[in-house]
């Protein structure tokens, strides 16, 4: 006589198995017969970066503060103020920027126009640049221009920064991208919990569960899709049962101290983001807890930030252009000479 075995299957709802977006510069892709290097695993890394900037208040506040500080220090006779500001934003958000350069027949610069960096792709030798508003869409149009070519009357000047992975730049806060994702997910989770007015941390026991393994997996999948994830936090559970004996049991888990865990996670991820920028939180309006911050301490922190972060960023940005295209000015709008490397 065979032993009667009970099969118990435990499913974990809400597991996170999607890896963070990666920069992969080894794959060559084709788009409208153009051969370019993929910008990320799915050629969407800059879109991912920009979305992170738009959704994370801390990241946006730091980047906006840095750009504002740099913009006050630069001027150009060849680039409009608006385009110069956009170049600075791309420089900090993506780690690089791109502009369209128009030259006369004698190769004198006539005009420089800003190009959204997320729309640029390049070939493996960084000699050809491709521009499209709809990468990945078969209906998108692609423009092809020589890259960083001073002998062409129409070209793209492409700056990929000092920190690169192959042909594309890496933003200075790359190490904090996971923390930025967590910050955004925490906000989404709490918003969903408030909207649904129900915050559950439960085990669902499916009674009379004599189902095949395939059916169990399908039930688990459906529950995961409907109730797991930050965007589904706090949804009401509605079940239909043929009898009370066969009803599903929902057991609420108490004592997990989720509030404390979220507070600790929120604090550690914020610190991680500021560390990536080598910034003190108080410089961007986030005051330290349980202790004061004097004017002297603020001034010292600002001086260190200017010396170690802002000045190097400023010099690198100005030197990335041809001499005289972008210049540094003092508080009286007087030009400060910079020795080109």
Task: Locate the predicted segments by residue.
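A contiguous, surface-oriented mixed alpha/beta subdomain in the mid-to-C-terminal portion of proteins
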Residues: 162-341
């Amino acid at each position: 006589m065979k032993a009667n075995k009970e099969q118990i299957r435990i499913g974990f709802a809400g597991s996170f198995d999607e890896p963070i977006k990666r920069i992969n510069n080894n794959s060559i892709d084709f788009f409208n017969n153009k051969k370019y290097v993929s910008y990320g695993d799915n050629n969407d890394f800059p879109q991912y970066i920009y979305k992170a900037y738009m959704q994370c208040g801390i990241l946006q506040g730091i980047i906006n503060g840095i750009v504002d500080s740099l913009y006050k220090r630069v001027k150009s006779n060849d680039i409009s103020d608006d385009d110069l500001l956009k170049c600075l934003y791309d420089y900090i958000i993506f780690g690089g920027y791109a502009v369209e350069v128009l030259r006369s027949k004698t190769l004198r610069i006539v005009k420089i126009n800003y190009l959204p960096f997320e729309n640029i792709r390049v070939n493996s030798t960084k000699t050809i640049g491709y521009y499209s508003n709809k990468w990945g869409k078969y209906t998108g149009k692609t423009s092809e221009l020589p890259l960083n070519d001073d002998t062409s009357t129409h070209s793209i000047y492409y700056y990929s920064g000092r920190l690169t992975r192959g042909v594309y730049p890496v933003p200075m806060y790359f190490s904090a991208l996971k923390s930025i994702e967590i910050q955004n997910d925490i906000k989404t989770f709490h918003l969903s919990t408030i909207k649904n007015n129900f915050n559950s941390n439960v085990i669902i026991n499916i009674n009379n569960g004599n189902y095949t393994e395939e059916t169990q997996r399908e039930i688990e999948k459906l529950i995961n899709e409907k109730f797991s994830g930050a965007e589904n936090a706090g949804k009401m559970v509605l079940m239909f049962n043929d009898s009370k004996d066969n009803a599903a049991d929902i057991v609420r888990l108490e004592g997990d101290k989720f509030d404390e865990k979220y507070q600790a996670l929120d604090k550690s991820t914020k610190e991680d983001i500021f560390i990536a920028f080598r910034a003190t939180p108080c410089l961007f309006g986030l005051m330290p807890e349980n202790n004061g911050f004097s004017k002297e301490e603020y001034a010292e922190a600002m001086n260190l930030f200017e010396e170690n972060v802002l000045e190097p960023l400023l010099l690198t940005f100005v030197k990335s252009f041809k001499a005289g295209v972008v210049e540094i000015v003092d508080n009286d709008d007087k030009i400060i000479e910079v020795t080109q490397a």
